[in-house]
A protein has these predicted regions:
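Conserved micro-motifs of the catalytic ATP-binding
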Residues: 2-6, 39, 43-46
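Short helix-loop "hinge" at the ATP-lid/N-box region of the Bergerat-fold HATPase_c
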Residues: 62-63
Length: 163
């Protein structure tokens, strides 16, 4: 019998984003990454500990696959019954042929094999956690840069507060 290791509660997205940035501040500073957080006060239901873990993995990937003058941008949007947290970097991107497989266990992709040593476990774990927590996860890359989005469902109460 396994106990669930998460607690979903109402969290202001900027708070979990700032916590994740603080967790990774040494890595970000050492690699001269410019960080921008667009904050419009959006709220979502989540387990902040695990969402921080997911964001730290995304930050780690952005640093690993950075270009000169690396930057990270966190932004939120509301579409229909969802709040979307997007993390965009200006790194080397992900080849189109690799995109469908980025969540597969052990998949390192072309860049993971040629540019950096990669285990292929990070995004796989993120996807598993998102599935457990009821959060959507998508990755988009158009050659240069990558955008990773966490998609939080919102209920009627939250929609009323934020709408």
């Amino acid at each position: 019998h396994t106990e669930k290791d998460y607690t979903v509660r109402e969290i202001r997205i900027r708070d979990v984003v700032h916590d994740a940035i603080a967790d990774s501040k040494y890595l970000l500073r050492k690699n001269h990454v410019t960080v921008e957080v667009e904050d419009d006060g959006k709220i979502a239901y989540m387990d902040d500990k695990w969402v921080r873990f997911i964001l730290n993995q995304i930050i780690s990937n952005a640093v690993k696959y950075r270009t000169e003058q690396p930057s990270l941008r966190f932004s939120t949007a509301q579409k229909h019954n969802q709040v979307i947290l997007s993390v965009e970097d200006n790194g080397i991107g992900i080849p189109q042929s690799d995109l469908p497989r980025v969540f597969e266990k052990g998949f390192t992709g072309q860049n993971g094999r040629t540019v950096h040593s990669s285990t292929g476990i990070g995004l796989y774990l993120c996807k598993r956690l998102c599935d457990k927590l009821g959060i959507g996860l998508s990755v988009c890359s158009q050659g240069n840069g990558t955008s990773v989005s966490l998609i939080f469902p919102i209920n009627d109460f939250v929609a009323g507060v934020q709408g």
